[in-house]
Structures are given as C-alpha cells and as structure tokens.
Amino acid sequence: MQARAIEPELIPACRKYGIDIVIYNPLAGGLFSGKIKSKDIKPDEGRFGTKADRVGSMYRDRYFKDATFQALKIAEDAAQKHNLTLLEIALRWCVHHSELKTRAKGGNDGVIIGVSNLKQLEGNLADLEKGPLPDDVVKSLDEAWMAAKATAPTYFR
C-alpha cells in the first residue's frame, strides 16, 4: 500500500529505460503486523520504539500519521472478511496487484522482505507463493491508498 507513491513517476521512467524495479519495506517496517493501532501508541522496543533513538523517530515520522492508521483499518477490515492477515495482503498485493512486473507477471521486478526470525521468513515466503487476492480486498486496498496517499512517504528522501 505504501509503495504506491512510485506509481506516477518512477515506474513509468524505469519502464521507459528498461530498468527493473525492486522495492523494499513492503510491510512498512512491520506496521502491517497490526500490533500498533494508533500514532499515539509509541512502543518502547522495536523499530518504532522510543528506545530505537534516531531509527525509531525516523520510522514514526514516516508512518505515524492519522491517515496511515485509517488506511490500515480499511485494509485490516478487508483482510478479516477473508480470514487473511495484513502481512499477507500486503505481500500478495505487491506480487499480484501492484504495477510491479514480478515473475508472477512475467517480469524481473522484485520485493525485498526483511524478517527478525525464521518463523517470519517462512510465513512471508508462504504468503508470497499464494495467488492473487479476492477482488473486494484489492478494491479495499485501493480505498486504503486513497486514504493514505496525501500523507504517504515519498519514494525519494
């Protein structure tokens, strides 16, 4: 969902010049775990944690916006209707519904995933192997993007 900021300019430029695209951070630093539900909740530990000093502050500045959490709520509601997780719909959307031309779509674009342990890796890989999302979930993710778009982080810093 957050990766869509690259759609209007970067993806067309890369396509024009034959450059493959590899995105990173498809789970918004773990925000798609669903553990944090509000910008007002600042955990002590973890990537968004207050003890993470500069990194925690950077991630909170990047993602802790009302619109982001509104979008996550839209996505989570859609996921729950199909017994899916936020993590799963984020990864499956990147592979099957984004403008990336992944191998699933005959291209070489890719998605870099990051994990903290083997269980997360196995779960993410299993989710990446699943097929496209139900149409109503994709529609909800489009709605979520519209909710978050105005305050979404840019692809350039």
What are these regions (language model features)?
Residues 1-148, 154:
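Beta/alpha (TIM)-barrel catalytic core signal, keyed to glycine-rich beta->alpha loops juxtaposed to Asp/Glu
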